[in-house]
Amino acid sequence: MGLATCLSLQSCSRPQAAASKSADPLQGKLVLTGSSTVAPLAAEIGKSFESKHPGVRIDVQSGGSSRGISDARQGTADIGMVSRALKPEEKDLKGFLIAKDGVTVILQKDNPVKSLSDKQIVDIYTGKVTNWKQVGGKDGTITVVNKAEGRSTLELFAHHFKLKNTDIKAQVVIGDNEQGIKTVAGNPDAIGYVSIGSAEYSAANKVPIKLLPVGGIAATTENVKNGTFPISRPLNLVTKTEPQGLAKEFIDFAQSQQVSDIVKKQNFVVSK
């Protein structure tokens, strides 16, 4: 009798457990593609969202802001990730600000150069200056690290310094911020430019790089926040149409105060 009672209780408890798992109305999968700057942030937000909604999976893939725009338009991604403002020809898309960031120049930590003027940066990237001793550093051939086409970090950098990508004479072309940081950290003669958030996070975790000021303004998250840093940008999620259902719930969550600590931990600026 006891065994029968036990079996009966077990059989009764299973539907209840199943019911509790399916009680959350949010179910399904979202695919996010695009900016390598936004991707780590979106992935962490995604993990938090998944923990609240066990029936949901968030798949985050990087590849550049151009990919985020293209995939959102074509419907190959539910949400695109774009680390810049939308262009006039992209206004058919819906944009949602989730954080702010800046772009700055980085050097290997042991490089004695502490700052570069805008003109010196332009001269280095256009091949007019090729040795560190020409800008007050040690004798050493400069390794110029540039971003690949389609990266919004490149667009922002080039726009600020009034450069065309065809003007830039680079020895190394990289994709995401992590590649750029690793390349510069491993080469005392390298110069690159990356997301301030990514660079600050790496430097705080003992990666041997340093962030140079731009226009005399220190490259810090705080200066992006107070609006004094000259190269700043919005970090956006984009959709083809007004989001609904699971996509809307995720975007609302990504814009909420619930993710403020995640944004700050990634060294970005909270948007609200």
Residue map of PLM features:
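Exported/periplasmic ABC-transporter solute-binding proteins
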Residues: C12-S66, S70-T76, V82-K272
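Sec-dependent N-terminal signal peptides
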Residues: M1-A4
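C-terminal motif of bacterial Sec signal peptides marking the signal peptidase cleavage site
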Residues: L7-S11
